[in-house]
Amino acid sequence: YGSHEAFTRAFRELFGSTPETVRDARSLNNLTLMEPMIMDSSTALTLASPRIEHHKQMKLVGLTKLFAMEQIGAIPALWDLFNRHAGHIPNSVGPTAYGVSLSFSEETGCDYMCGIEVMDFSDVPADLTARSIPAATYAKFHQPGHITLMRQTIGTIWNRWLPDSGYRADEQACLVEVYAGEFDARTGAGGFDVWMPVVK
């Protein structure tokens, strides 16, 4: 940033308060969790072996946005918007939240959805999107660590597990992130799952 004022303005736009207010409060509890813009996705992690399971079609309601590659670090901001709707979506199946890469390419970026599963699309709020996620066979990985390990986890699955697994990625299906009841959306702790769609 070119000046203290520019930094303060950007900080306030992102977090809704000034750096001075946060410092004086001596607490980060009211700040939105944001992924760093640049994270090391090249370092492999040690992951437990996945479960290979077929999963039925899911109907999800939530928010979608196309992120260019240089904007992927802003995905947590979409979650912050979605979390304001959580608990108020009609026909929801349960509290588990899903992050879905509807499409991904180096050229166009990632078309990403965050949402929850619903029984049907009969009562979708006007400001939310409804999408059907096709049935697929998934390698289901559990990551017990913090949400900031997401990119490293996905990188490990793609670059270390998949080449030696006897499977290949199912390009007709979607990569799915699963945030069950143990996950704390405020702190990013509690662990999460990554479902890699696969075919033999």
Give the label of every model feature segment.
Residues 2-200:
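A solvent-exposed interaction/effector surface
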